[in-house]
């Protein structure tokens, strides 16, 4: 089954081999969660396409065509299933793709689908020509970037129509359509029903006043409680609230209309549905695609736990008490926030770092109105840091030493001048080199920042205090040797070792 998975991800055509088609049909029959989001099934007798976990009536084998992406299925003329809802499927990690460029572009298109960006601007952001990007993208996904972007917009709209009571006009704008008429035409052309028809079919949504709720699927096993524990130990006063069942934070993002949207987002687990429940304040609707992308990154919903577990077997066999099934790497919601906090946390305890960061955000963070006690600030922007007359004095009087204040200032300058990129689509290895050129940032900080902000799967923190505590008999060089066979998933090895300390 695992070889089938590998062939499926890397193969040119899932339908070229009768053997592979039969194997994928068996996956579809079994509802194997490992393949959710990695293959979609078009059914010729109904004209719809499904996730592999769909519970609708099983179609005949001869009526099935297999696709690697929802966009590829839609380009072939299939409509999304109303039962399994392909828009909720987990995505793929960067390591899953032959073309790192194509995967980075896909992430950017999905996160920014509500904006008016062009394919040429995406290519330029990634450092390539539009022609090169289109060629790489089509070779990887079987569709053009424009087709993929259209599917992202339509599936986001379908999710908002199904899960919220937002007016159709707001759904259209929040999904990247320039007008309601254009939205209605596209929806009807591709899904053969109008947005209003979809609303009638779904019944009444459960909606809390002033909020919207969306759902994000993941592949089990998924250790949500350990992610929450990680975030709870590092919760930033005024910005984050974490309890036993949920994570809540302030949000400040640019919306599709170019205006800044401020509000809050809450994330909870629905283990029975293998999905996260994401509730956000109504003010964030203009930035909903970006909020969803950031929650996916923060909670590592695109990870494939089977592939990761196989890679970490040497660690589990060598270290008693290490659990590898379902381990996730905690990402972040605000990349600059985490980069700054990584510097603040150098050579001090987590608790001390939290207090320092809390003082900084209380003094210099922008006030955010959320209506939730304890959530009233956003972390500093790059421009906020650069506007400080003397960062050493500003942060120094709050307890941060000069070298770390200077490092934060240098990071802000590098980002502002385009020498450092922590945004979605960045190449982690290149940005780690850029980070290491900043005085005051060493290998630990560079790897930690890449792991948390860029979903870099292969960072290892051999000098980290927690890793050393989990492997007390080994030197840093021996710790590196221990996890060499875990490549390219050593970030997950770090989390497995940290988690073992609380077990």
Question: Where do the model's predicted regions map?
Answer:
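HhH-family (HhH-GPD) DNA N-glycosylase catalytic core used in base-excision repair
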Residues: 2-503
